[in-house]
Swiss-Prot record:
Pathway: Protein modification; protein ubiquitination. InterPro entries: F-box-like_dom_sf, F-box_AtFBL13-like, F-box_dom, FBD, FBL60-like, LRR_dom_sf, LRR_FXL15/At3g58940/PEG3-like. Transmembrane segments: none annotated. PROSITE patterns: FBOX (PS50181). Residues 3-51 form the F-box domain. Part of a SCF (ASK-cullin-F-box) protein ligase complex. This is F-box protein At4g27050. One of its GO terms (biological process) is protein ubiquitination. The lineage of its organism: Eukaryota, Viridiplantae, Streptophyta, Embryophyta, Tracheophyta. Pfam families: F-box, LRR_At5g56370. GO terms for cellular component: cytoplasm; nucleus.
Length: 453
C-alpha cells in the first residue's frame, strides 16, 4: 500500500504548501479526503487569477441567445468562486498575500469589497491587475500593515484622495504602478506622498513630475506619447541611491538627486540621427540633459544604453564625473560611440569599464576611443592612454575582424589594465580559435591578465 507522506505533515506545514499554489487548486484539495477538508483556512496567500478557471469554448451550432447566456455564466463563475472562498476564510488568521487578476469581471462594488476584505485582514502584500478600467474606492484604500503594493493596467485609485500629506499606507516599502491611469497629474504624487516609509518605487506610467523625500530605489519606464516632445521632467528624490530611468529625452530637467550612487539610463531621441555620406550629422536635435547629468555627477556607477550614448553626445555639456569608478555601456550597430572620448576624459578616476558588444556605427566623431577609422599619425594623446581603467569587461564577444581590431586597440592603449574579462557571445563558432586570437594580442600594460568568462 502506498504511503501518503504529505498528508501526515503537520497542519501548519500543509497550510504553507497550499499557500504556494493558485487558490483554485488549493480549494480543490478539500475533496481529496477528510484530512484535507478543513485546511483551506490555514492558507495565508490567496491568488485569484481569472485565467485559472475553466472557460469552455462555444459549441458548434449554439444560437446567439444560448451563447450570451453561457457567456454570462462564465463571466460570473470567477466572482462566485472568490465570494465563496472569502466567506470560508472569514474566521481565518492573517492573510499575508492577496493577488487579484480580473479580465472579464467589471462589478466595481464587488471587487472593491474583495480588496477591502484583504486589507482589513492585515494583508502584507497586495497585487491587483485588471483588463477593464476599474476604480479602487480611495475612501477605503488604506492599510496600516501593507508592505508591498502592485497595481497594473485597468485598476486605478478613484474618487478623492486624502489631502496632500494624508497617509494611506504608513508601512508600505515597495510600490509598483504599471500602466495605471490616474485621474490627474497631481494624484500620483499625492498617492506616493501617502506612503512615508516608501523605499522602492517601480513606475511604468507617463509622467513629468515625481517627488518623494524618503524613497531609495526608483525604476521609471515612461515610454508613452513618443510623438509629443516633453518640455520638462521634474524628479525630486533627495534620498535616492539607485535610479533606473527609461524615457524619451525631455527639453529640460529639474532634479534633486543628492544621495545617488548608481544610475541606469536609457534615454532616447525623438528623431533618429541622420548622417551624410561622410558620417557627419547636421540636423537640430531636441532635448537637453545637462541639468540631469549635473545632478548625478557624484555617482559611482553608471550604465548607459546605446541610445543614451547618442543623447549624452548631442544633448548635454558633460561635466567632470569625479567620483565615477564603474562605467557600463551597451553598443548597437545603428548607434555611434561619438561620446566615448568625451566620457572617458571626463571620468578621471574610472576603474572599471564594461562594454556589452563592440560593434557600433562607424562615424568620424568616435575619435580615438575606437579603431573603426584609422587616425593620422598626428598624435594627440589618446583618451584611452590617459584612462586609469584597471578592469575591462567585454560581453557578447563574437570574434569578428572588427571586434578583434577593437580589442587590439583597447589592449594597446589602456596603460593601467590589470584584468580583462571576455564573455563570448552564445553560439559563437571556433571558440578555441577565437580565444587564441585575443590571447595573442599585444598588451601595453605588463600587469594585464585576460580571462574568458
Amino acid at each position: 500500500m502506498d504511503t501518503d507522506l504529505i498528508s501526515n505533515l503537520p497542519d501548519d506545514v500543509l497550510g504553507k504548501i497550499l499557500s504556494l499554489v493558485p487558490t483554485k487548486l488549493a480549494a480543490a484539495t478539500s475533496v481529496l479526503s477528510k484530512r484535507w477538508r478543513n485546511l483551506l483556512p490555514l492558507v495565508d496567500s490567496l491568488d485569484f487569477d481569472e485565467t485559472m478557471l475553466f472557460y469552455p469554448d462555444n459549441k458548434d451550432g449554439e444560437d446567439e441567445a444560448s451563447s450570451y447566456e453561457s457567456g454570462q455564466r462564465r463571466r460570473h463563475s470567477f466572482s462566485h468562486f472568490v465570494d465563496k472562498t472569502l466567506a470560508l476564510l472569514s474566521n481565518a488568521p492573517l492573510t499575508e498575500k492577496f493577488s487579484l487578476k480580473c479580465y472579464h469581471e467589471d462589478d466595481g462594488a464587488r471587487i472593491n469589497r474583495w480588496i477591502r476584505t484583504a486589507l482589513e485582514r492585515g494583508c502584507l502584500e497586495l497585487n491587483l491587475e485588471a483588463a477593464n478600467y476599474l476604480p479602487i474606492d480611495s475612501q477605503y484604500f488604506t492599510s496600516n500593515t501593507l508592505v508591498k503594493l502592485t497595481i497594473s493596467d485597468g485598476f486605478y485609485p478613484g474618487g478623492h484622495l486624502l489631502p496632500f500629506g494624508g497617509v494611506f499606507f504608513p508601512a508600505l516599502k515597495t510600490l509598483t504602478l504599471v500602466s495605471v491611469c490616474f485621474t490627474s497629474v497631481e494624484m500620483i504624487n499625492f498617492f506616493i506622498h501617502g506612503c512615508p516609509a516608501l523605499e522602492e518605487l517601480f513606475l511604468c506610467v507617463w509622467m513629468q513630475y515625481m517627488s518623494s523625500p524618503n524613497v531609495k530605489r526608483v525604476t521609471i519606464t515612461s515610454d508613452f506619447d513618443d510623438d509629443i516632445q516633453r518640455p520638462s521632467m521634474v524628479l525630486k528624490t533627495p534620498s535616492l541611491v539607485y535610479l533606473d530611468y527609461s524615457s524619451y529625452v525631455a527639453g529640460n530637467y529639474y532634479v534633486v538627486l543628492d544621495s545617488l550612487v548608481e544610475a541606469r539610463l536609457d534615454l532616447r531621441l525623438y528623431e533618429p540621427i541622420i548622417y551624410d555620406e561622410d558620417g557627419l550629422w547636421n540636423a537640430e536635435v531636441f532635448g537637453n540633459i545637462t541639468n540631469l547629468i549635473e545632478a548625478i555627477r557624484t555617482i559611482k556607477i553608471l550604465h548607459l544604453s546605446p541610445s543614451s550614448l547618442e543623447v549624452f553626445y548631442y544633448c548635454c555639456d558633460l561635466p567632470v564625473l569625479e567620483d565615477l569608478v564603474n562605467l557600463s555601456i551597451e553598443s548597437d550597430k545603428e548607434k555611434g560611440w561619438e561620446v566615448m572620448p568625451r566620457l572617458l576624459n571626463k571620468s578621471p578616476n574610472l576603474q572599471t569599464l564594461v562594454v556589452k558588444g563592440l560593434v557600433h556605427r562607424v562615424t568620424y566623431c568616435c575619435g580615438d576611443a575606437c579603431a573603426c577609422i584609422r587616425m593620422k599619425d598626428r598624435e594627440i594623446v589618446s583618451c584611452l592612454s590617459r584612462c586609469r581603467v584597471k578592469v575591462l569587461k567585454i560581453l557578447g564577444y563574437g570574434g569578428s575582424f572588427r571586434e578583434l581590431k577593437q580589442m587590439r586597440h583597447f589592449l594597446g592603449k589602456l596603460k593601467c589594465l590589470e584584468t580583462v574579462k571576455v564573455g563570448v557571445k552564445e553560439g559563437s563558432k571556433k571558440s578555441n580559435y577565437l580565444v587564441a586570437n585575443v590571447m595573442a594580442l599585444p598588451r601595453v600594460s605588463s600587469k594585464c591578465k585576460i580571462q574568458f568568462i
